[in-house]
Each structure stands twice: as C-alpha cells, then as structure tokens.
Amino acid sequence: MTAKIFIDGEHGTTGLQIRTRLAGRRDIELLSIPETERRNAAMREDLLNNADISILCLPDDASKEAVSMVAGNNNVRIIDTSTAYRVHQDWAYGFAEMDRDQGEKVRSARFVANPGCYPTGAIGLIRPLRASGILPDGYPVSVNAVSGYTGGGKQMIAQMEDQSRDDAISANNFLYGLTLKHKHVPEMTIHGQLDRAPLFAPSVGRFPQGMIVQVPLFAADLAEGTTIETIHAALTAHYAGQDIVSVVPLAESKGISRIDAEELAGKDTMKLFVFGTPGGEHINLVALLDNLGKGASGAAVQNMELMLSA
C-alpha cells in the first residue's frame, strides 16, 4: 500500500530538502499544500489528518499547533523537526544509532522528535563514552562547532548570499549563542546522558552545507587508564554494524592534517574521529556531517523509513 506523507512546512529549508529526497518515489504519495495556502489552518489540518506520516518542518509554536490538530487521530504519526519535543518523555528521539534499540523505538513510535544538527554530532560522540563509563559524572564537557549557513534557514541564507540587503552578513565566520544558552543545550544534556549541562560554543561559516562538532577532553580527568585507543574502541563498538555513522580508524586519522567541514555536504552519513597529542594527555573528538543531511532532512527521511517498516 502506498504511504501518504505530508510535509508541513515543505517550502522552508528543511522541508524542501525532504521533498527533494522523496520526489519521484513510487512507494509514497506526497500530499502537498500550495505555498500561498501554507497559513490556511483548515487545509493544513485536513492534510495532517489524512497522512500516514506528517513531517513537521516548522518553528516550535507552529509544531505544537500542528500536533494539537491530530490529537484525536491515532492513525497519523508525526516526525517533528523543531526543538519543541526533543526532550519530551513521550516522544521517541530520532537518532536511530544512539543506542542499539533506538531504531526500534523510532520504528514503533507514533511521535518522533528529529534531532538537532549540533546535538547529533555532540551526542554521537558523548553518549558512547557515558555508556562505557569513560566520561565520569561531573565532567565539564565543552562542545565547539561550526555549521554551514543553511542551518539558519531562509533568512540567514539570504543574509549570507545577498550582500545588497540592509541586514546582510559580511563575515566569513562568526560566533553566536554568546550567552551560552543555545536551544540545543538541553537536548545535548538529556540525550548525552550528562549530569551537567555542556558549555556549547556554536559558529557559522560562509559555506552552505556541512558541519564540524568538536568535544575536547583531558585524559587525566576521564576514567582511570583512559587512552586515545580506549576511547576509539568504545566508539567503534558502539557503532559496530551501522551504515550511516562510522568511526574513522586511528591509523587513518593519524594521517589527517585538516578536516573539511564540507566533506559530507549532500550526504546523510556522519563520520567520527579521535585525535590527540602524542602522549595522549589531550584528546579531541570530532564529528563530521551535513547540517541538512544527518543533521536534519536526511535523519527525517531515515526516521520515516523506519516508521514505514513497522
């Protein structure tokens, strides 16, 4: 049977990416709303309730409104790409590789919260170390990251690409979230299984798609006996058998002198690296992904596939 999919917010950055990925598929029927009618609540509600899966690509408040529109309809399932439900206990977190059984949780869920781009990289690095006992309680985790400017949506895309605008951004790279209260911090804390919120310093570069997330660590403050090798082994074991998330071999990492944030642009995979000083005192964990791929639209399609396979 052909599954009916509705993308609420299909004309935004994430929605367009999802629609592009699904275009031409014969196993699904894409329900669509004209851009001129995107604020037509009655039309949206009808489409939301007639879909097998509705994918919400909306701001937080609009996502909550959409969820309320299907409250009495158990036949429709929801994937939400906003931050509204990412730490909600009744929603499955849509990072399928996060744990061995996470894919099954997504498969059987009615409500799935798509992960944020930065948290996907951060949690991908941190959670295996918490699960293995390498990263102790109370460790002051810091997360540094750079994203392609498409992560800021249509407004930032226009600001970066059209220098004639009054609000144009001329910087090639800029920090933001300077109050250290970024909306992704709760998500990193909860799903990273941290007992202390991380210090998160995000930035944006003048490139459309791509992302580097770094988690630097002091080996002396980790579990006794921790080395670059034991961290790499923990990550490798955690993601064994996974196709989308891969851990780069240490021998290969030792030959790398730089990492290109755009390497995985246009792809839905994520690479994890472990680097460090020769003596192993300082360790740097790195996640490489596309902010619109595994960090957004690619993950949404992956979650949709899991839900359709139930």
UniProtKB/Swiss-Prot annotation:
A Gene Ontology BP annotation from the UniProt entry: L-arginine biosynthetic process
Residues forming the catalytic site: C117
Superkingdom assignment: Bacteria
UniProt-listed PROSITE patterns: ARGC
InterPro entries: AGPR_AS, AGPR_type-2, NAD(P)-bd_dom_sf, NAGSA_dehydrogenase, Semialdehyde_DH_NAD-bd
Similarity remark: Belongs to the NAGSA dehydrogenase family. Type 2 subfamily.
Name assigned to this protein: N-acetyl-gamma-glutamyl-phosphate reductase
Gene Ontology CC terms: cytoplasm
Organism expressing this protein natively: Agrobacterium fabrum (strain C58 / ATCC 33970) (Agrobacterium tumefaciens (strain C58))
Catalytic reactions of this protein: N-acetyl-L-glutamate 5-semialdehyde + phosphate + NADP(+) = N-acetyl-L-glutamyl 5-phosphate + NADPH + H(+)
Signal sequence residues: none
GO molecular function: N-acetyl-gamma-glutamyl-phosphate reductase activity; NAD binding
UniProt keyword annotations, A-Z: Amino-acid biosynthesis, Arginine biosynthesis, Cytoplasm, NADP, Oxidoreductase
HAMAP family assigned: ArgC_type2
Pathway: Amino-acid biosynthesis; L-arginine biosynthesis; N(2)-acetyl-L-ornithine from L-glutamate: step 3/4
Known EC number: 1.2.1.38
Subcellular location: Cytoplasm
Main function: Catalyzes the NADPH-dependent reduction of N-acetyl-5-glutamyl phosphate to yield N-acetyl-L-glutamate 5-semialdehyde.
Stored CDD domains: AGPR_2_C, AGPR_2_N
UniProt xrefs under PANTHER family: N-ACETYL-GAMMA-GLUTAMYL-PHOSPHATE REDUCTASE, CHLOROPLASTIC-RELATED, N-ACETYL-GAMMA-GLUTAMYL-PHOSPHATE REDUCTASE, CHLOROPLASTIC-RELATED-RELATED
